Amino acid sequence: MIESLYSEFEPDITITAKKRKTFDEREINWREIKKCKGVSSFSKGLEEVVVLRHEKKWVNATLIGVESNFLKSIKIKSHLLAGNELFKEKNGAAYGIIGVDLMQKLNAKKGFQSEHEQILIYAPKRNIKIRFGKTPFYSGQIAIAGIMNYNTEINQEKILWPLENARNLLNYSSELSHIYIDVLPKISNDEMKTKIMDVVGDNFVVKTNYEKNELIFKTSKSERLIVIFIMIFIFILASFNLVA
């Protein structure tokens, strides 16, 4: 159960810059990534720590700006508690999908289709000198379309928003912080990791979903082993009682 909740939100492969927070998407040979045998899909991502505000409630969160195909990758429809996966409309209107606990911290409620709850968002400006009378934050509004439920970390900290809108808020143009890759079922993540590393080079870090959540997966396996040992012990005790 624990593994499925983490693995469904975490793409099979994640690429980040080795020594930088962000990188220009033009540094990536997208054609070669597409040509890698076993790549099911990929999505560009931009993650940033932000502050969300609703009325008098202020909460720290992680904004994840992604392309719409990322929602399919994380099986968003199976994890929506309320609302829908509406992300970007043809008229340009954009919507966010927020973790259930984060929504509760803000004391906000999912509105009707015609009146989406509005959340204020603040992100620190980069490389500026703080001066009196000038705000050190970029700011904007996110209309909430859906509430998602995965695991404690996602539920308490994450909010999804279209990549283009996240870039506009953060004053980026072609920067990314992550690339998320889904791998076809018959291809191992470790095998795909090796292929991707050859494409992106030494300036990037490539990790499988297991490597990103290694402690969680190991803990889950340890818990299963403990349960098995307990069951064996109970079975042995029961056998002795029957013999007696």
Q: How does the language model describe each region?
A:
Residues 1-62, 68-92:
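Hydrophobic, regular-secondary-structure patches
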Residues 21-26, 53-55, 71-76, 92, ...:
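Solvent-exposed, non-transmembrane alpha-helical starts
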Residues 47, 69, 101, 164-165:
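Alpha-helix/helix-capping structural signal
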Residues 69, 75, 98-113:
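Short, solvent-exposed hinge/capping segments at secondary-structure junctions
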Residues 112-203:
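Basic-flanked hydrophobic alpha-helices used for secretion and membrane insertion
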Residues 185-243:
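Peri-transmembrane interface segments
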